[in-house]
Design a protein with these regions (language model features):
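Active-site beta-loop-alpha junctions enriched in small/polar residues
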Residues: 17, 37-39, 60, 94-96, ...
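Extracellular LysM carbohydrate-binding repeats and other cell-envelope/extracellular binding modules
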Residues: 2-29
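Substrate-binding surface in catalytic domains of secreted glycosidases
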Residues: 64-74, 147-276
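Glycan-binding loop/region signatures in secreted carbohydrate-active enzymes
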Residues: 95-107, 247-304
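Second-shell loop/turn segments in exported
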Residues: 45, 64-70, 106-114, 140-148, ...
Length: 304
C-alpha cells in the first residue's frame, strides 16, 4: 500500500527502494473512497487500491420481501484483494431493481414497513460481518418525501446493529437547499442523515448525463453550491465529495427525448480527441475541458 509505484504488483527486485511507512503528513489525514463492480479488471483494481481508504463494492440490492440480492459475480475475491492493500471494503446497498434501475416503488415497499426495515437492517449487519466488510454504504435514490424519516430510521437502526468500528456511508443527491423540490432530492434530509451516518458522499456529478443536453458532468459553480449547502447541515469531517472520472459523447443537434450520449472514461476521451485531431478547449464557466469533432455518418453526411 505504501508503494503505489509498484503498480499493484507484489514482486520486488534487489536494489529497489521501498517505503515501509510515511511520516505524518503536515496537511493532515486524507480519506478516499471508490466504487467498484465485481467484474473489474484485477490489475486495474490493484493499481488503484493503494490510493483508497475505502472501497464500495457495487452492489447488493433487495427484493420487496426484504431479502438481499448479492452483487453479480460474488464479492469474495474483491473483498480479499482490498484487504491485501489495507483498504476497507464496504457493502453497498442500493435501491436498484433486478432490471438495473433505481426504483422509488422498491424504496416505498421497504420504508413503509417498520418490520421490513428492521429485517433489512439485521440482514445487512449480518452479511457485512460474515462477508468480511468493514461497513455499509447506503445508496437509495428517488425516495418519496414522506419516507425521508423512514430512511433515517433505517440508518439509525443499522448503527445499533453493526459492531464497533464499522462505518456507515450514505450517498446524498446534490441539493442546494432544504426546500429543493423533486423526487431525487426530497427524500434526502441532509441534517438528519448527516447526524445518523458516519460519513456522507455528495453525488456532485451527473449534471450532464446520458439522456440530458450536453453539459459538464460536474460544473464547478453547481458543485460549489452543493458543498456550501452541505457544510451548513453536516460537519465537514463527515463529508466526501464525489468526483467523476468519466465524460459523455453527444451527437449534435441534441433532441430532447431522442438523443442518448455515450459514456467514456477520461482516458478514452483523450484517445478520441487524438483520433479526431480535435482541439481540447476549456470552459471558463463550468471550469472543465471539452472538445468538438466531426464524423461522417452511415448516410454519407456528417455529425458533430
Amino acid at each position: 500500500r505504501n508503494n503505489p509505484t509498484l503498480g499493484g504488483k507484489s514482486t520486488v527486485y534487489p536494489g529497489q527502494t521501498l517505503n515501509i511507512r510515511y511520516e505524518v503528513s503536515p496537511l493532515g489525514d486524507v480519506y478516499t473512497n471508490g466504487y467498484v463492480y465485481t467484474y473489474v479488471n484485477r490489475d486495474v483494481l490493484r493499481k488503484t487500491l493503494p490510493y483508497l481508504t475505502y472501497l464500495s463494492v457495487f452492489s447488493h440490492g433487495f427484493k420487496e420481501d426484504g431479502s438481499l440480492l448479492p452483487p453479480e459475480g460474488g464479492d469474495e475475491e474483491i473483498i480479499s484483494i482490498a484487504k491485501e492493500y489495507g483498504t476497507i471494503p464496504l457493502l453497498t446497498l442500493t435501491s436498484i431493481t433486478e432490471n438495473g434501475t433505481f426504483s422509488s416503488e422498491l424504496v416505498e415497499s421497504l420504508l413503509s414497513s417498520p418490520v421490513l426495515t428492521s429485517s433489512v437492517a439485521a440482514s445487512l449487519a449480518e452479511t457485512a460481518v460474515e462477508n468480511g466488510y468493514g461497513g455499509v454504504d447506503l445508496d437509495f435514490e428517488y425516495i418519496p418525501s414522506q419516507y425521508a424519516d423512514g430512511y433515517v430510521a433505517l440508518i439509525n437502526e443499522l448503527q445499533t446493529l453493526l459492531p464497533e468500528g464499522y462505518v456507515i456511508f450514505t450517498s446524498l443527491a446534490p441539493k442546494t437547499s432544504a426546500a429543493q423540490s423533486g423526487l431525487l432530492y426530497e427524500g434526502h434530509d441532509y441534517g438528519k442523515i448527516g447526524a445518523a451516518s458516519d460519513y456522507v458522499l455528495l453525488m456532485t456529478y451527473e449534471w450532464g448525463y446520458t439522456y440530458g443536453p450536453p453539459l459538464a458532468v460536474a460544473p464547478k459553480p453547481q458543485v460549489r453550491q452543493v458543498i456550501e449547502y452541505a457544510l451548513s447541515e453536516i460537519p465537514s469531517s463527515k463529508i466526501f465529495m464525489g468526483i467523476p472520472n468519466y465524460g459523455y459523447d453527444w451527437t449534435l443537434p441534441y433532441v430532447r427525448g431522442e438523443s442518448k450520449a455515450q459514456s467514456l472514461s477520461n482516458i478514452e476521451a483523450l484517445r478520441l480527441a487524438g483520433e479526431k485531431n480535435a482541439e481540447i478547449m476549456f470552459s471558463e464557466t463550468a471550469q472543465t475541458p471539452y472538445f468538438n469533432y466531426f464524423e461522417r455518418n452511415s448516410r454519407g453526411g456528417a455529425s458533430e
